Regions:
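Metalloprotease/metallohydrolase-associated module, dominated by Zn2+-dependent proteases
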Residues: 1-60, 77-129
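Active-site recognition of the HExxH zinc-binding catalytic motif
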Residues: 64-76
Length: 129
């Protein structure tokens, strides 16, 4: 089943990547959707890895996860800084807003997502808003 979902999820991730790479005039970025516990962005190889469980959480959350990893590249390519700094969070919020998504954070990771009307559309298991 997961292999089928990876095949389903990858084109969605690639479309998001292409949109953001073109909008921000970034160097090419490769993207993989894998059966792994967490995702990452690797600057030297220009590779993003997205866990398939993020897709299984729903399309809005999957978009947010992919945009989170792409935010790392925008931040790095424009400021040469790594990690979850203020500029990174600004970029991530801007990208999410472009899809009508409003993040609610626990530190720098999502604990919930709302739509631009304020409706809760995703909540991490074990959390309240």
């Amino acid at each position: 089943m997961r292999a089928d979902k990876i095949i389903e999820a990858k084109p969605i991730a690639e479309q998001l990547r292409d949109l953001i790479v073109n909008k921000y005039n970034l160097d090419p970025i490769r993207i993989k959707v894998k059966d792994t516990q967490r995702g990452w962005a690797t600057y030297d190889t220009r590779l993003i890895s997205i866990p398939i469980w993020a897709y299984l959480e729903g399309l809005d959350y999957f978009r947010a996860y992919v945009l989170h990893e792409l935010s790392h590249f925008i931040n790095y390519d424009t400021t040469k800084t790594y990690g979850h700094c203020k500029n990174f969070l600004r970029i991530e919020k801007e990208l999410l807003a472009g899809f009508g998504l409003v993040p609610i954070y626990k530190r720098v990771y999502l604990k919930a997502l709302k739509n631009d009307k304020g409706d809760l559309i995703w909540l991490k298991r074990g959390y309240n808003v």
